[in-house]
């Protein structure tokens, strides 16, 4: 009688030791991508063109002239002004994300050139506390607006945020009015402001400076809105249009000016800056 035992793997063979992070699964098409190739492609899927998140330094490298970026306001740091208590203190969270991201805050600001045109630049990083806007984020952005106004130099803000930072309470909500007021002065002086919305741009950020650009761009399929769809549905008791918080829906309704593929972003910005300056 033949044995029905399962074949045994020879003891001499070992499982392959695959380094962690070698492959990345695309949420758009579920394919596995070689991480190094993905990074060389500006973190855009080769197959479905899904745009993965970028860290602030990566975004800066993608759009600025090489070696032109000079960081400003790096000395500003958030503090736990309210003594926020939770599972972890606010200070513990700040320390954790500073170590994790090698950033001081959720926004990196500075001066640069794009196509040899001087620009003041603010780039938010969702990896730092969800890109949330606290008092320091609001202050850094406001200072860059004021620098732009003083130098009559175009301003570019790249948003990636879940909204206001709850650990700072009203201090974070105040930044909405502060940044909006500063942008009003910039507008009155006819200094160009370009806003780029990336995935996600939500809540207090889209309700303030992110939606006030002279030109508003967005990355493909970026999630953009004030509240989450579940909250809106429960509040209004109405069925919501499919994809109503995507860049494509907002473009159709006229709330943004153009959707720009990441590979075309630098050339698009160069053209816009040329026309606006």
Swiss-Prot record:
It comes from the Bacteria. GO terms for biological process: fatty acid biosynthetic process; malonyl-CoA biosynthetic process. The gene is accD. Pathway: Lipid metabolism; malonyl-CoA biosynthesis; malonyl-CoA from acetyl-CoA: step 1/1. InterPro entries: AcCoA_carboxyl_beta (IPR034733), Acetyl_CoA_COase_Trfase_b_su (IPR000438), ClpP/crotonase-like_dom_sf (IPR029045), COA_CT_N (IPR011762), Znf-ACC (IPR041010). It is an enzyme of class 2 (transferase). Its main location: cytoplasm. One of its GO terms (molecular function) is zinc ion binding. Binds 1 zinc ion per subunit. Its EC number is 2.1.3.15. A zinc finger (C4-type) spans 26-48. It is found in: Cytoplasm. This is Acetyl-coenzyme A carboxylase carboxyl transferase subunit beta. Its cofactor is Zn(2+). Acetyl-CoA carboxylase is a heterohexamer composed of biotin carboxyl carrier protein (AccB), biotin carboxylase (AccC) and two subunits each of ACCase subunit alpha (AccA) and ACCase subunit beta (AccD). Keywords: ATP-binding, Cytoplasm, Fatty acid biosynthesis, Fatty acid metabolism, Lipid biosynthesis, Lipid metabolism, Metal-binding, Nucleotide-binding, Transferase, Zinc, Zinc-finger. Residues 22-277 form the CoA carboxyltransferase N-terminal domain. HAMAP family: AcetylCoA_CT_beta (MF_01395). One of its GO terms (cellular component) is acetyl-CoA carboxylase complex. Zn(2+) binds at residues 26, 29, 45, 48. Belongs to the AccD/PCCB family. Component of the acetyl coenzyme A carboxylase (ACC) complex. Biotin carboxylase (BC) catalyzes the carboxylation of biotin on its carrier protein (BCCP) and then the CO(2) group is transferred by the transcarboxylase to acetyl-CoA to form malonyl-CoA. It catalyses: N(6)-carboxybiotinyl-L-lysyl-[protein] + acetyl-CoA = N(6)-biotinyl-L-lysyl-[protein] + malonyl-CoA. It comes from Methylacidiphilum infernorum (isolate V4) (Methylokorus infernorum (strain V4)).
């Amino acid at each position: 009688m033949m044995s029905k035992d399962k074949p045994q793997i020879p003891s001499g063979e070992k499982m392959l030791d695959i380094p962690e992070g070698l492959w990345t699964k695309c949420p758009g098409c579920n394919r596995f991508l070689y991480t190094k190739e993905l990074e060389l492609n500006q973190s855009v899927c080769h197959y479905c063109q899904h745009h993965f998140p970028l860290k602030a330094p990566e975004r800066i490298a993608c759009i600025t002239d090489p070696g032109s970026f000079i960081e400003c306001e790096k000395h500003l740091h958030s503090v736990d002004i309210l003594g926020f208590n939770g599972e972890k203190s606010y200070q513990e969270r700040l320390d954790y994300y500073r170590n994790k991201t090698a950033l001081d805050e959720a926004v990196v600001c500075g001066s640069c050139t794009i196509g040899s045109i001087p620009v003041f630049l603010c780039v938010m990083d969702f990896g730092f506390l969800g890109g949330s806007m606290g008092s320091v984020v609001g202050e850094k952005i406001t200072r860059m607006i004021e620098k732009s106004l003083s130098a009559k130099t175009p301003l570019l803000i790249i948003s990636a945020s879940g909204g206001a930072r709850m650990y700072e309470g009203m201090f974070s909500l105040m930044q909405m009015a502060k940044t909006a007021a500063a942008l009003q002065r910039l507008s009155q002086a006819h200094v160009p402001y370009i806003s780029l919305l990336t995935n996600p741009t939500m809540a207090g950020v889209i309700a303030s400076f992110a939606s006030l650009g002279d030109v508003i761009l967005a990355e493909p399929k970026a999630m953009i809105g004030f509240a989450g769809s579940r909250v809106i549905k429960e509040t209004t008791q109405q069925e919501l249009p499919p994809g109503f918080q995507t860049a494509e829906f907002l473009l159709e309704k006229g709330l943004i000016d153009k959707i720009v593929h990441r590979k075309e972003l630098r050339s698009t910005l160069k053209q816009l800056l040329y026309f606006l300056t």
